[in-house]
Design a protein with these regions (language model features):
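Alpha-helical repeat scaffolds
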Residues: 3-15, 41-53, 78-92, 110-120, ...
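A cross-kingdom marker for long, charged
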Residues: 127, 149-183
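Alpha-helical scaffold segments of alpha-solenoid architecture
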Residues: 59-116
């Protein structure tokens, strides 16, 4: 039921955004980042398809596609039958932009070291570290959790990747009933 509620909420947000590609891009970013945290590939795919329908900017589309791909890898989900991730990545204009480098990295055209060396500033360097760690985590390597925790505590706190790293490394608290009856 929660999954269906999340999908309905995303659909409503996209309906409210209409054809405004900037607003739809923001909705897609939020939905795809939530999908990664919830390990829900279908939620991410829904966000990606809508972002593509409104022709979201490359800077939004690349992140949504990356997060959907990582979600698929983390859950061992097969790519969608329409291969939306590949279509989105191939639609990104190639050149020297950071979005282009991220798309190339996701397609395997750049390795982690090449992505890191192409990062020009603190946000890009943080993102390069995040994606290298996430690729390992998606493959089952939990030894990268300290690296993600470092990213979460780093100086690029405004990045969605920093928030994702924080959420992924936060201790999980099990809440239960109190040991004795409450008054």
């Amino acid at each position: 039921a929660d999954r269906q509620a999340a999908l309905r909420a995303v659909q409503r947000a996209f309906e409210a955004a209409g054809s405004d590609k900037d607003t739809a891009g923001i909705v897609a970013i939020e939905a795809a980042s939530d999908a990664l945290l919830l390990k829900d590939p279908e939620l991410g795919r829904t966000a990606l398809r809508r972002a593509m329908e409104v022709d979201a900017d490359d800077e939004d589309l690349v992140y949504v596609a990356l997060w959907v791909r990582l979600t698929e890898q983390m859950t061992a989900a097969k790519p969608a039958h329409d291969d939306a991730v590949e279509k989105a990545l191939k639609s990104i204009e190639r050149g020297t932009s950071w979005a282009s480098k991220l798309a190339d990295w996701s397609e395997g055209k750049l390795d982690d070291a090449a992505l890191a060396s192409g990062a020009r500033d603190l946000p890009q360097k943080t993102e390069a570290s995040f994606y290298a760690a996430m690729r390992k985590l998606a493959a089952g390597d939990r030894a990268v959790l300290p690296e993600l925790a470092r990213i979460a505590r780093g100086n690029a706190l405004q990045l969605v990747e920093s928030r994702l790293a924080e959420e992924l490394t936060a201790p999980r608290v099990q809440l239960g009933s109190p040991g004795k009856p409450l008054p």
